[in-house]
Amino acid sequence: MSNETTKPVNAGFAKILPVMFAFFVMGFVDLVGTATNYVKAEFGLADGTANLFTTMVFFWFLIFAVPTGMLMNKIGRRKTVLWSILVTLVAMALPIIAYVALSGTARLVLIVISFAFLGIGNTLMQVSLNPLLTVFVKGDKLASTLTLGQFVKSFASLFAPYIAIWGATQLGMWWILFVIYLVVGIVGYVLLAIDKIDEPAPDAGTTTIGRC
């Protein structure tokens, strides 16, 4: 009888590339800070009102974290991440519509709604993305791969202010940031949707808060 220990097989980088793309999309939530600076100046908002935008984005985690875990148990990890990207894409599209078709209070309302969608999408992704990564990477490499994912995520927040400044100075449209990130998000969604992932079957039993 063999005493050899079976080591976990880790997927190559090409297999986890779509997941790394999803980590980048998860970083979109940090552009709220950049967007708030421009929105505050455009609409003459008070500091307290503008600060509520950032707080509101992360408030959604308190509301949706547990329901997202329940959802993930029902539909699986990848589908939950895909839904999170779709919600984030809606968040990217709404400001574009606001600046192309609306003005005044209607524009501000749509931007605020987009921030809410961004917070909800980020919550869905925070709950489901790390578990999805464990399908590909196991053992002692998991911690370093999670760190890599957070590193990739940080680039989204790093690039956001520079893209907004470029858009404002060169095009007169700081919100071109949302257009660029919308395109990147679509690419990330497609890559993850077509990737073949052999993940554990969704929980077939009754999903409760206690089991999340």
Describe these PLM feature segments.
Residues Y38, G69-M70, K74:
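Membrane-interface helix termini in secondary transporters
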Residues L86-G104:
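C-terminal ends and interior cores of transmembrane alpha-helices
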Residues T55-M70:
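Central cavity-lining transmembrane alpha-helices of secondary-active solute carriers
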Residues S114-F151:
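Cytoplasmic helix-loop-helix junction between adjacent transmembrane helices
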Residues P8-A35, A116:
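Pair of pore-lining "gating" transmembrane helices in MFS-fold secondary transporters
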Residues L148-I197:
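Helix-loop-helix hairpin linking two adjacent transmembrane segments in secondary transporters
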Residues T34-G48:
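Short amphipathic helix-loop junctions that connect adjacent transmembrane helices
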